[in-house]
Amino acid sequence: VCNENGEALDRVSIPTETPEITMPKMIAYFKEQQVEALGIGFFGPVILNEQSPKYGCVGNTPKLAWKWYPVLDEFKKALQIPVGFDTDVNAAALGEATWGITKGLKNSIYITVGTGIGAGVIVDGKMLHGMQHPEGGHILVAPHPNDTYKGKCPYHGRCLEGMASGPAIEERWGKKAYELSDKKEVWELEAYYVAQGLVDMIMLLSPERIVLGGGVMHQTHVMDLIRKETLRMVNKYIDTEELSDIENYIVLPSLNDNQGILGCAKLGMDALTAAK
């Protein structure tokens, strides 16, 4: 729970189980807090096309109990307050753009590298949705010549998420990312794949800054490797002031892992404003 200045007033963590177990707990909490509006940043894919009859539903998720669950409608029905709705990574992008390291920029990308990989894209000051929402983790990447790993993604195999997410690291190397901190070869390979995704996004979307968050990025020593690999792959084709200052172009989040919560607060505030 936050106020209009983005200051956290209260918080609780509720495990994601089935909708039948999790939703009543969340609804009860927000009723108790008597919030004026709610912002939801939900795991994707979700349906964000307001013209779709499935708007506000979870899409084709591997969390089968949540597949096509009408998250937005259930919260609206239970709470009877304005509700803003987006993906979890879009909420994080919005949090950084409102209060964090991309504040004041019109074009930025927030990428989370963790259990999955996702991208929240802001273009001309607005969140990019389009047909659904960007699925930056499923960009196809070229395998490293010495990498025989087939990829973790059940849909695409060797996509960015399939090659560089936390579960991919664990399956390839036999240990979780935090247990591999001192293994240079792990992070050089991670940088090789993450940089491919960044270069694709730089070429296509021309962001003014890229933020890399998520659990894998807690291994902060990988940042310099990613920056170096990104510049190598760009190969001076794009030669801007931003890229020449790469340490301030590809950056870590600035909101102490609160960017998602604060982005949800902004979604709620925007929904409240729109309802007046």
How should these model regions be labeled?
Residues 35-39, 84, 108-112, 118:
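Short glycine-aspartate micro-motif
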Residues 80-81, 104-108, 117, 124, ...:
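Short coil/turn connectors at secondary-structure junctions
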Residues 92-98, 118-121, 140:
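Adenylate-forming
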Residues 1-37, 46-54, 73-83, 95-105, ...:
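ATP-binding/phosphotransfer module of carbohydrate and carboxylate kinases, centering on a glycine-rich
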Residues 42, 113-115, 214-215:
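Short secondary-structure boundary segments
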Residues 88, 114, 264:
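Active-site glycine-centered loops adjacent to acidic/histidine catalytic or metal-binding residues
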Residues 52-67:
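A charged helix-plus-loop insertion that forms the helical arch/lid used to bind
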Residues 1-8, 110-126, 169:
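Gly/Thr-rich phosphate-binding beta-strand-loop-beta motif of the actin/hexokinase/Hsp70
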